[in-house]
Amino acid sequence: MSFSPDEINDFKEAFLLFDRTGDAKITLSQVGDIVRALGQNPTNAEINKILGNPSKEEMNAKKITFEEFLPMLQAAANNKDQGTFEDFVEGLRVFDKEGNGTVMGAELRHVLATLGEKMTEEEVEELMKGQEDSNGCINYEAFVKHIMSV
């Protein structure tokens, strides 16, 4: 997949929104956020691989230009391992004890905080905000739509 000139201009605009110092550069730690803001869904492990597995110090100190970032975005876009809507719904269906399209909010919180790419409590709360019904249940298809649009 290659990008059109218009897409590249849009990507550069988004990239520059993350530039905190006005030098048209971002830190490596921001790459995942920008890639996700541009519609890709790579895991943190995939981002680290694309970045060449930098140290924590490099993640916060090393800066890159848009020209260095674009091939990284390309690599994320070309990765066929990204989960689809159906993949995520299928993964959550395992926790649907009643078979009614919902999962318990408490159980989903636990899963997000302890399995796979573990999320912090704050990240989980931010993601779950407004998703539970009065019984503490979450419609997981609506939840997946929500997280894929964030």
UniProtKB/Swiss-Prot annotation:
Superkingdom is Eukaryota
Where is each EF-hand domain found?
6-41, 44-79, 83-118, 118-150
Question: Is Repeat included in the keywords of this UniProt record?
Answer: yes
The reply on keyword Cell inner membrane is: no
State the UniProt keywords alphabetically.
Motor protein, Muscle protein, Myosin, Repeat
Report the InterPro entries cross-referenced here.
CALM/Myosin/TropC-like, EF-hand-dom_pair, EF_hand_dom
PTM Blocked amino end (Ser): at which residues?
S2
Q: Name any one GO molecular function.
A: calcium ion binding
Q: Which PROSITE patterns match?
A: EF_HAND_2 (PS50222)
Q: Name one GO cellular component term.
A: contractile muscle fiber
What post-translational modification information does the record give? Answer: The N-terminus is blocked.
Note the subunit structure.
Myosin is a hexamer of 2 heavy chains and 4 light chains.
PANTHER family this protein is in? Answer: MYOSIN LIGHT CHAIN 1, 3, MYOSIN LIGHT CHAIN 1_3, SKELETAL MUSCLE ISOFORM
Q: What is the recorded name of this protein?
A: Myosin light chain 3, skeletal muscle isoform
Q: Which organism is it from?
A: Gallus gallus (Chicken)
The uppermost taxa in this organism's lineage are: Eukaryota, Metazoa, Chordata, Craniata, Vertebrata
